[in-house]
Amino acid sequence: MSQKHLHSIHVSHYKHTAGCATEVMPVPDVVKISMSQHIGAPAKPLVAKGDRVLAGQKIGEAGGFISANVICSVSGTVKAIEPRRMVNGAMVPSIIVENDGEYETVEGVGEDRDPSTLSKEEIRSIVKEAGIVGLGGAGFPTHVKLTPKDENAIDYVIVNGAECEPYLTSDYRMLIEEPEKIVGGLKVILQLFDNAKGVIAIENNKPEAIKKLTEMVKDEPKITVCPLLTKYPQGGERSIIYAVTGRKVNSSMLPADAGCIVDNVDTVASIYMAVCKSTPLMRKIITITGDAVAEPQNFNVKLGTNYQELIEAAGGFKTEPEKIISGGPMMGQALFTVDVPVCKTSSALTCFTKDQVAAFEPTACIRCGRCVSVCPSHIVPVMMMKAAMNRDCETFEKINGMECMECGSCTYICPARRPLTQAFKEMRKTVAANRRKKG
């Protein structure tokens, strides 16, 4: 198996919660369940104010081909359907459910099911009905990903267990606490692709996970565990495909175009739960960490739980946070309020003290080339920044600015402290909007 690697950086891991076993967080009195927890069209509400709903009930139906169902995480009463703020600041239609404390589930939830008796289309339908999306942060509807144009061209199914983002440990805890779900979910996916082999890719700074998964798959002829070098952004889709297969994927391609299906460990475990245990997506494992947090921890959380309640479950703040990030410091989203709900793509809440947050004034580029040397997309950030400063979309496209994966490596390494990644995010949005206008 190939062991190639794209350009990368070494970052401090800060995996302080790696040894913290996942705890089930107390269920809140109210959950706020967004209709837009995925890439694509928002889901359409299927309930009305005053309705009683059950845990496991579909309360939002996919609003298009690229969309996903939304499942209620508690039983109770719909108190409102109204716009609520999400992590990215957008006001999104949401269903507010008052938890009745009975935790009554839809009939059939939790029942065992033998996946070997299911057809490929039945498996895909179950995944769709369960509301499963890419849980590593992308949020792409999983049933769509599992339906490539040519399923016979898929020869790799890669389980992404790299978790290269600093501070995050939720995937690691799942690897060592629930490996049977990951292996079981991978076996289900392999039923869909007759020519594929399964690879569980884990960075080599997680030896316990590698050992445990290797032992679990020793008698599985189509599944192997692939230890990866510990680099950032090793968990990026393009990076992990190249590391495992030696194949390159650009922005105009899907992983399926390179014969690969890539799913995060939580996504694969959720497929197992949906197909083998008749349990739709109702929960997430979330890391709450950072020096401002009294008791950093990994929590098993009901979707729709408020971030503020997550903080309280971790003992609150031991010191006033200077910055709070949904996710990790490299690719996470800074928050101006914690009055937002946990959604399908949530992975962590990282709370920094003032001492942890460095504020620098950017200075002039010294053309050192460090940003070029670490870019996994092999593009030239220094030239892209010039185009971004001039709002020159044409040049930005010509120099392959749309190949940027927004990993933050260039910003991290820049001695002039220039906000490269932020500028590229804005330019990519502008270029994409211009393309849509042109049709």
List where the protein language model places each region.
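Gly-rich Lys/Arg/Thr-decorated short loops/hinges at beta-loop-alpha junctions or inter-strand turns
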Residues: 105-106, 134, 157-171, 292
